[in-house]
Each structure stands twice: as C-alpha cells, then as structure tokens.
Amino acid sequence: MRKTLLSLFMLVSVAVAMAEDYTQYVDPRIGSIGLGRTFIGPAMPFGMVKPGPDCVNMPNAGWAPMPEKVAGFTQTHVSGTGGGQKYGNILLQPYLDGQQLREGVMAQRRIGETIDLGYYSCLYQNHISTEITTAGRCAFYRISYPQPGRLFIDASWFLGKDTIPDKREAQQLVGTHVSIVSPTCVEGWSSVRGGWNNGDAYTVYFSLHTDKAFSVLQSDEQTCRLAFADETVNIKVGISYVSCEKARANIPANTFGQQLATLRAEWQKMLSRLKYQGTEKNMRMFYTALYHVMLMPVNKTGENPKWADSPYYDDYYAIWDTYRTSTPLLGVYYPEIQRDIVNSLLNIYKNEGYMPDARSGDCNGRTQGGSHGEVVVADAMARGLDGIDYELALQAMIKDAEVPPADHEKEGRGGLQEYNTLGYIPYGIPRAGTRTVEYAFDDWCIAQVAKRLGKEDIYDKYMSRSGNWRNLWRTDYEWKGMKGFIMPRDAQGRWLDSVPWGKSKVYHPLIPYRPDTKVAPWYLPWWNTFFYEALSAEYSLSVPHDVPGLIDACGGADAFRKRLDTFFAEGHYNVANEPSFLTPWLYHFIGRPDLSRDRVTRIINENFSDQPDGLPGNDDGGAMSSWLIWGMLGKYPLAGTSQFLEFPQDDAIEQKSQNDMLMCFVLNRQYRNWPYSYRWNGDILEVRCNTAIYNIHRNVVDNASGFSWESAQAKNACYDNVSGTFGFISKAAYAALLAKGRFTYDGITWRKVDETAENIHVRADKDNTEMWIAKDRELPIVMKMKNNPLGIDWDMKQ
C-alpha cells in the first residue's frame, strides 16, 4: 500500500489548461479614459510592439475617444503612465486620393471603432477601415479602402512633440531615414530623444511589407506616400531597436487571422494561471487588470543596441510604482518572467553601473523615490526564484546604498551622502522625506538578501540603517489628536515648523508645515517637494518593513487604529497613490483583518469599475491593476518577503499558481483530491502534499537520481532531509532527457516518446509505465501517469 501511494506522488502536475476562455473577460477599454491612461491597442504579453492609433492631442498611450481625430497608427506605446509621453514611432495613415496634409498631419475623423483583446479596428468618415493585431515584434494591418487607396508613412512622427527645444519630458527628433526597397517593401528608422525619462536617443528601425504592389507618389528622408490599385491591403511592420535587417527578421509568416489566433492563445495561457469566479462585472475587472499587468515591462531580449547579454527587459515605468504589488504578483504566478526581469536588472547593472528604478528607450531614469531594485531582488529571493546570481545582486544593491551616482535622477540614490552621514536627508534636498523612508526600506531589503547569503556583518549594518525612518519621526508633533509624524528637519537636526513655499528668486514666503501640506504651489511638480506624490499623513503610515515599530511610535494599537480611522475619515487616503497601497491593510497588524477587509472592499466598490474610467489613477505599468487583483483575491503581499496579509472574500476565488496544484486520483474506489504545493525557503524546497511536509535541499532538487518514498498519509508528518525528489524529477535528470532523450531514475531508464508545447511524454523500459513531465517550469514536475502496474492512473488539475 505504501508503495502504491508513493507512486501517486510522482504524478504531481502544474496547471492543466482550463476549458473556460478567460480572454472573453478582457476589455482593453477599462482604464483608458480619465486617469488610468491604459493602452487600448493589441499587445502580446510583455510584447515590444504595441500598435494603435495616435490622436492629434497626443495622449500618453496614443488613443483618445471620439470625436478626437486620429493622426495615424504608430507601432510603439506605453500603458498607464503619467508625466511626459514616450514613443509613438513610425506612423501609418491610410487616406484617399485628394486628401492633403495640414500642418504635417493628415488627421481623420472616426465614425466607428472596435476595441478587443488583441484586435483594434476603426472606420474613418471616408469609409476607410483599418484593422490591427500584433505579434511581439511585428504589427499586422488589414486596410480596406472604398476605392483604390493611399498610405502615408511618417518616420518623423512621435508623441510629445513640443516647440520649445529641449523642454523637459518632451521628445525631440534626432534623425530619420525612409527607403523604398521594392514595390512591396519600405524600410527605415527614426531616432528620438527625451520623453518622460529625459533619456538619450533611441532608434526604432522598421521593415514594412505589403501583400499588394504599390506605386510611389512621394518619398524623402522622413516620409513617403504610396498608392495601391487594390481596395484591400495587408501590411506587416517588423520593428527592431537594432537594425532594419533585424526588423525584417522579426516578421512572422502568419496571416492576420492566424496571428490574432496565436495572440489570443498566448493570452489564454497566461490569464489561466489565475482562476477567479465572480459576477461578470468582477470577472471583467479582474482579468482586464491581470492583462494590464503584463503590458509592461517589455521583453526586448535580443533587441538591445548596447549589449548582447540576455535576458533584457525595458520600459520599467517605474519600479517605484510596481514593486509593491506587480513585483510580488509576477513572482508568485509568473516566476519564469520575474526571474528574467531580475536578471535583466542585473545585466543593466553589469553594463551601465546601476540597476534602474525606472527605464525606457534603453536609458535609465527617472528615479522617483528610492533605489527599488533592492526590493525586486529581495522579493525574488524570498519567493525562492532560482537561476539568479544573488551574489552579484547584493553587489549591485550595495553600490546603490554606498556610491553616489553622477545623475541621481537617472539612477542610484540622491542625497546619499547626507543620508549615510546624518541618517536622514535634510529638508532642501528634493523629496527628502520620501527618500529617507524608502531608503530605509531598501536597506532592509539589502539586509534580508545578505542574511540569506550568510553575510552577517552586511546584514547587521543595513538592518541598523533600516531604522533611519525614525530619524524624521517627530514624536512631539500632534495633529488632529494624533501624535508623531514624519516631518522635515534641517541638516543641523532642527525640526522645521515652517518651510518656504515655492522657488521664486525674489520671494520666499514661509508657510506652516502640517501633515496635510504639499510643500509647493501648483506650478511646481512633486519632484521638488519634501514628499513625492504624497503627504506626511500618508508617508507616516508607510513603513512596510517595520509596521510593529510604527505602531509603537504611534502610541500602541488603540492609537494606531484611531489614526487609521481618522486618516480615512478625513479624506487623506488616496487610492491612486502607491505609498498608500498598504494602508487599508494595516488593520491586520492590530488584529483586525475584518477592518482591512471592510476598507479594501469599500475602496474597490467606490473607485474601480468595468467602465472606460474604471481606474482611479495612472495604472503605472500595472501597479494600480495589480493592487486591484490582490484586493479581489483577498490577500496582499508584503513586498520583499514571502508573506501575505489575508482575509476571506465574498466571491469564490481559486488561485492558480505554478506551484499550487491539485492531485486527482482514484484509490480504494474513492475519488481523491490532494493539495500539492511547493515553496522555496532559502536552499530548502518545502513540498506540501495532503497533510505532509517534505523538506528537500537544493542539492537534491538539482542532482537526485530517484524519488522519495515517504508517505503522505501520515497526518501532519514532517520529513526533513528528504533524499529524493517528490512529485518531480531532478534538474539533472531533466537535463539528460533534453540532451539524450532519456534519463535513469531509481535504476529504471525512461525514454522520450513524444512531446507537446507543455509536456515531454516518457515511457519506462521496465514495465511501460508512462509519465508526462512539464516543460519550461521552475521544477520538472510529473504531470500525469498511465499504465501504472499498481493499477492507479491519474491526472493533475488546478
């Protein structure tokens, strides 16, 4: 019997494809109007190319609702961003004979529009229909004209143009080239600098191919106009940041319809990792939010013009926004993606000297609060993501903490010398309050990584520095019945009751500083204030690494609850503001998760919807959407750790992580469902099956030559130092299977029979037992067994 049960455990599976089509719940219109600023065009998960309309008023994501006119369709966009624009490169505009450019733009009025996952179409007033879908690095167009049509191509177009040279956050044209290669091909490039991160020039190369021959009406270095004899034209636009040759190679053979099907299948695969059940409205909110999380950053592996190291991701907009909610979500449900993102940050460090806090157009910047690559690394390590050089990561983190950068807006830490000398950043240095509090959290993350690497001296140093938030905690300041706040202090250690209002060269009025004061008039941005995008009332509740210490500083649990209640009642909570993401969950720390639930549920109901204005603030690369996802799941991650705050939710929720599974089988004529999951805890893989726990060392995971034989039927059993794998084969055996088509386990040779995109099918020489082993996963898990001589066949489900 024991061996019968143990054979069962070899068959643990990752997610089996669900029958339900989750793509039907994605509505790209959600969050596109108002503050959300999400991208509405077609996109692949983490796709580099995002084709869509650019309206003449140039919103950040290109699109604006009707009746705003369309300047054309460009191939590159961001999603959910505030501040200045970025991208909007290589414009295509279909038109009819007789239409003319006006001030360099051939704007068209829409009379109809369709927005769906992976598909965009619009009908112009002149009855030209444009349909768009995309691959990861190639845009697909199907244009239907009411008569033989024209196409305008403009390599000089981009979003965020400004008449003032070198205006902050505006993009500026550096150069272009357009070349007619053949009667069906146009190639060229556009080089643009600036934008939101004030970055160096980036160059977008394109290779455009049509399925119908064209004649050339006009061509120069910036633009061309083409004429078609046909009324329907299919166009593919390959994009590269390296060369036209690479852009050409990025064009797949698929037709428009085939590519749309491929795109939707890929989204189904990604969305199905989380299974949420609720009302149709909530399903749309949930899966659209999950879709938004996977729009940025973008996978540009092989498309970095500066170095060849891979992987490479770009468009971190910004880690200051995403580290709290998006980073843990990817680490839990998409660990292979998050592993690549962390390694990309380390490749940037190796080649440019610092990990970015933000990056776009292959250029670091702009750093907003802290150096939050530290949080991303600590979060990955806490969640057991392997394949990352954590020694190198610690080196990069320490450089952030010790070496002042040449340009602190681009990378690293501003005010670092003062922070390391005084233990805080004094008033007068921009964002001094934000930086002090967030550097303390970053230092705590450094300490956690150092501890896991066994570097106690480094751990002690940065744990000490993680308490620096207390150096701006003014214990005697009382406001609205609350005592103690993060407040401004000068370099001599004096607390400032009043601060200058603005930066006028001739007039410096002083105003009293209070916890609800924004220390700048309307004409100055958040970059120059004591807190970035927040108030003291908000940041005085934002110490995620030391909430118990914060509660003590506030006067204990009762005073802390009163502070939270007052904070919400007085309207200081800003749902759209990342420093407040954790705040409604803080009731957990005083033993009242029910109050956290009440707050979060109310916030979701009052501020989010499935309508175009359904996001209350900038989505910021999925930060706002991932906050919504966690709220709907009834749990919240503590970034930099593997811990969650949890409460029950009314809607039935099933979370589908790659490492949370359900083993389904028949034993003794009874149908069984046994939960199976695994989590890394340092170098120990903790496997849970039924009520048993198996602690397996990393060396065993990597090199074992057989399965473990401990029973999972023993109630609450804990097996330490397990010598074999449990529910999966070792990485060495999997490597042998890939290289040789066979592996040996427990003295039995298993040979490859066939494979699919998800599994490798193997059969044992000894008794023809069959297994299906998962491909491309964190662990090579056995997903299915058949023809078991013990008479037990089973499948694994999620």
Predicted regions and their residues:
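Active-site and channel-lining beta-strand-loop segments
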Residues: 488-489, 773
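Acidic, serine/threonine-rich low-complexity disordered tracts
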Residues: 651-798
